[in-house]
Amino acid sequence: MLTERKKELIEKIPKAENHIHIEGSIPWELALRLAEKNKVSLPVHSIEEIDSWAHGLIGERGLDGFMICDRTLNSVCLHEEDYEAVVLALAEEDKRQNIVYQELHLDYPLNEERGIPLEVVMEGYRSAQRKARELYGVEIVYIAGLDRTLSGERCLSFVKSLRPYLDMVAGLGMDCEEKGHPCIKHLDSYQEAKRMGLFLTAHAGEDGGSDNIWDALRKLNVQRIDHGCRAAEDPELIRYLKERDILCAMCPVSNVYSGAAASFEAHPFLTLLRAGVPVSISSDDPPYTNSLTEELMTDAEKMNLTEEEIIRVVRNGFAYSIQGQGYLPAFDAWVREFQRKGAD
């Protein structure tokens, strides 16, 4: 059981989040409202039905099952105001959890395959980015996500299409089903993104091997690894990540849920953390898993994290972020006050 002090720490500490997907994080209540508004037929008609349907698919098919859920619920977004509404709903929830800085992966290909123009999606997200700060005091940073299952040519075209949006998009990532789709398939996209000045990250080692992580690091020259579970199986890779101070933005609850990790006890997060690899914790796709606060509570309890480890992991979310380092002085001051009160 968590102590009351650890619970208070997790609830009240200022937070950053490095790894959460917009399209996978549409609040289910909002998804149902948008489906009704836009006359989109869904196979589920209540939050309870969504929960049962999603658990069944993900339990049976893991990451592939999640992608079916993701694509299905994302189909409710058709208009600029829909995309704005999703991000603003996330920002409102951020405020409740004391999340002041959040990096959101936007997976436009999930919209492109439905014929939604890029400008509709991006202008909705642009408006939400501005309003999130004004209404909720939350800084939103966007990472454009490649669907690694698509062709290299199509992904490169997407990266080039981001040029008019470099004022709002700060990074390039890669996600979707990993098996059978090695990172190197999208080398041209990453080289183009680097020329455009984008921060580079990639999902690797989630349901694929450590070789995918090596390819992302050495061939794509990424500055961060998303998930990175299989890194813990490779001592040389652990040393590499530690020596080069490369963050693994991890999502333990999501990994256990999808089968990428057998259990919390077997999750590689602790191995990496205690080996000195920078790790942060994020919620990944909160309607399916937990909010960030709930994620931290669960991980701290299941993995028996110390108070110092909780603080270090949360601090890493700012320290290794794309542009959230400016929050560190206020974060460190908050921690000092929390520790001082505990010592009184």
Predicted feature descriptions by range:
Residues 1-198, 207-215, 219, 223-224, ...:
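Metal-cofactor-binding active-site regions of metalloenzymes
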Residues 203:
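Short HxH-centered metal-ligating active-site micro-motif
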